[in-house]
Amino acid sequence: ANLVGTEQFMKWVYKNPDGINKVLEVTREAAVAAENFAFDNGADYYVFAEPTAGPALLRPKFFEKFLVPVLKDVVDRAKGPVVLHVCGNSDGVIDMMCDTGVAGISIEEKADMKADVEIAHAKGVKVFGNVATATTLFSGTPEEVYQEATQALENGTDFVCPGCGIAPPSPLENLLQIKKARDDYFSKS
């Protein structure tokens, strides 16, 4: 969507599907080049972030129609494992995200971790997330981060981590609470 602008992209979903397919063809090849460059240079896995593909902006039927075929191809051509992140509450597309062949999905705090883990694990897909990036990690207390990370683990996340990126000025102490929660959780298991 960034190539033509989010608003234009969303209009094209209805009015210019051929334009959508042309944009996605360009991004498909760029995505394959980027992921394999990373793998050729030692990456263990590659994360694709889809900021405009979530149900808040794109209906699930259009996610399935336009994005799933492209994502499947990008994942198939990857030289290593791929994780797919869809911003916002991605509950409406979790099943489709898992059907792209990814090794993992990354979900935000808005998504239902328990339900999404159940869907993903049934398909052999790992789940990453879902400590809130802005409200908890960036502006919350260390105790809040610890509590939210522990909750994500209790809800079944395979990899406890921020639900989205990490804001550069996030307090280091808050970031360390994710590790502490993980260590404490698994020392009790």
Model-identified regions with their sequence ranges:
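Active-site loop segments of alpha/beta catalytic cores
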Residues: 1-189
